[in-house]
Amino acid sequence: MGLQETIGIEIVSVEKGKAVVQLEVTEKVHQPFGYLHGGVSVVLAEHAASIGAAKSIEPDEIVFGLEINANHLASKQAGLVTATAEAIHIGKSTQVWEIKITDETEKLLCISRCTIAVKKKRK
């Protein structure tokens, strides 16, 4: 079982240049004060960027997160959050994605930028 299954990330849609994932905010993803853990938001953002990036590579390639940053703008104690990742740059060896995490009312909770490395699969 991967991290996405452990915390409950669900894929909504994936297409070249865009990916959308969701997560139900429950106690298992809270920080000590009862709010969505910032690290979980970063995991959600990188997961969305990674699955989106995977749609733009060749069958003999694989993607890895190279760098990520996140600005946490608002908190959330319960409910559904949605991460929408959109490609800013799709190159041969790197991709750059912007990810916005919103709640059910479209309130922006977190904005993130993720750089993805594209590598050849090892044989």
UniProtKB/Swiss-Prot annotation:
Pfam (any one): 4HBT
Reactions that this protein is recorded to catalyse: 1,4-dihydroxy-2-naphthoyl-CoA + H2O = 1,4-dihydroxy-2-naphthoate + CoA + H(+)
Pathway listed: Quinol/quinone metabolism; menaquinone biosynthesis
UniProt GO molecular function: 1,4-dihydroxy-2-naphthoyl-CoA thioesterase activity
Entry keyword Chaperone: no
Gene3D superfamilies per record: Hotdog Thioesterase (3.10.129.10)
GO cellular component, as recorded: cytosol
Cross-referenced InterPro entries: HotDog_dom_sf (IPR029069), PAAI_dom (IPR003736), Thioestr_dom (IPR006683)
Disrupted gene: phenotype observed: Deletion of the gene results in an ablated membrane potential, indicative of a non-functional electron transport chain (ETC) and an inability to aerobically respire. Mutants fail to replicate in minimal defined medium and are killed in the cytosol approximately 4- to 6-fold more frequently than the wild-type strain.
Any Gene Ontology biological process: menaquinone biosynthetic process
EC number, UniProt record: 3.1.2.28
EC category: hydrolase
Active site, UniProt feature: E46 (nucleophile or proton acceptor)
CDD domains cross-referenced by the UniProt entry: PaaI_thioesterase (cd03443)
UniProt keyword terms in alphabetical order: Hydrolase, Menaquinone biosynthesis, Virulence
Chain's role: Catalyzes the hydrolysis of 1,4-dihydroxy-2-naphthoyl-CoA (DHNA-CoA) to 1,4-dihydroxy-2-naphthoate (DHNA) and free coenzyme A. Production of DHNA is required for protection against bacteriolysis in the cytosol of macrophages and tissue-specific virulence in vivo, suggesting that MenI is required to protect the bacteria from killing in the macrophage cytosol.
The family this protein is said to belong to: Belongs to the thioesterase PaaI family.
Protein name (record): 1,4-dihydroxy-2-naphthoyl-CoA hydrolase
Gene: menI
